[in-house]
Amino acid sequence: MSVTEHKKQAPKEVRCKIVTISDTRTEETDKSGQLLHELLKEAGHKVTSYEIVKDDKESIQQAVLAGYHKEDVDVVLTNGGTGITKRDVTIEAVSALLDKEIVGFGELFRMISYLEDIGSSAMLSRAIGGTIGRKVVFSMPGSSGAVRLAMNKLILPELGHITFELHRQ
């Protein structure tokens, strides 16, 4: 079956959990979380869960695993904590949970960021994607620009297709 055929069979509505990782954001100040919600809704997807967690490995893993265990979640989207400071532990937390890494997500995110957005600063991004069982997790930087780029260029065009692939096994 071709990619085109897979995309035709893919679900039109994907159920998502948004996790914002920040020591300072609140629901009112979480612009990237709000942007994720808007972009998903505009694309016809459903946000079934949303939370803000602190920049610590255990809290991040608990939030991701809570999404994994929920029946009404197909995808967990995290934003924040992907940089190189001491407090940035999202990648370590998420990668320890993954069954399979979607290596192309991070590679393409950095390439597009380099070419279209932030130039050589793209090398500092540690965005990651992967699967846990039949669910997918994408972890992206916390800036609104990075969220918009990741969603519009990479995640939204493939969200239904990825969900289809994980459920046809």
Swiss-Prot record:
Q: Which domain of life is it from?
A: Bacteria
Q: Does the UniProt entry include the keyword Isomerase?
A: no
Q: What is the lineage of its organism?
A: Bacteria, Bacillati, Bacillota, Bacilli, Bacillales
**Subunit structure as annotated in this protein's UniProt entry:** Homotrimer.
- Family matches, as PROSITE patterns: MOCF_BIOSYNTHESIS_1 (PS01078)
Give the species this sequence originates from.
Bacillus cereus (strain ATCC 14579 / DSM 31 / CCUG 7414 / JCM 2152 / NBRC 15305 / NCIMB 9373 / NCTC 2599 / NRRL B-3711)
GO BP term, example: Mo-molybdopterin cofactor biosynthetic process
Protein name per Swiss-Prot or TrEMBL: Molybdenum cofactor biosynthesis protein B
InterPro entries in UniProt: MoaB, MoaB/Mog-like_dom_sf, MoaB/Mog_dom, MoCF_biosynth_CS
This protein's pathway reads: Cofactor biosynthesis; molybdopterin biosynthesis
Q: Which NCBIfam families match?
A: molyb_syn (TIGR00177)
Does the keyword tRNA processing feature in the UniProt annotation? Answer: no
Its GO CC terms are: cytosol
A Pfam family that this protein carries is MoCF_biosynth
Name the family the entry cites.
Answer: Belongs to the MoaB/Mog family.
Matching entries from CDD domains are given as: MogA_MoaB
